């Protein structure tokens, strides 16, 4: 069975705050001022809390379930919830460039996969964010000013493969953002999820989505059966939760062959 792994949030936080129960310290990197520091989560304002190796334009690994590709293209990328999902153009300190996906969780805060921001040999120097990108159409643009990765993440630890990005403008007031839904024991509140992002194998400048079911839930991760590809690292895994709207239950980090 091919499926992908996700970071699972610690508790239900319908207003878009990340639960602190599983995280002790974060590495803060200010890409504008070139500074770094270790911080404890309580030091951060809630709305600022907001990460495949970061998938390059040529790394087109696929995870297709059952031999049939069920991904569908999103044509109206400025409708909800799609406008809150962004194409990421990533430049690392070693000069290499990558692509990825991220999603808004507040006016100026975004989640992505940790490996989109940090590897074992380098880390992000700059990230340009294109919410709702649709081919050459880029309806809104922002730049990353700071990012946070867990201090336990050094480039390969799947349990801590998440990242938080702070942007230079409140683009979320235009795009909208996802609420966050956490776990309760072995349940994440749903058995069906969607994964929406920018897969590189289908011309990665367009947004695609696929539904799937969840399984193998652990404290920090779970697997799903949605079809994905390189470039979708950092995509939201989410479901529609009635009056709470679209809530993310995880961050897509990688695909693999699970049997």
Name each model-derived stretch.
Residues 108, 112:
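Cytochrome P450 catalytic-core helices
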Residues 10-101:
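Protease-domain processing segments flanking chymotrypsin-fold serine proteases, especially trypsin-like
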Residues 61-83, 89-95, 99, 118, ...:
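Conserved catalytic-core segment of clan PA serine endopeptidases
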Residues 105-106, 218:
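Residue-level recognition of beta-strand termini and adjacent short loop/turns
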Residues 227-252:
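Catalytic nucleophile loop of clan PA
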Residues 1-10:
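Sec-dependent N-terminal signal peptides of Gram-positive bacterial secreted proteins and lipoproteins
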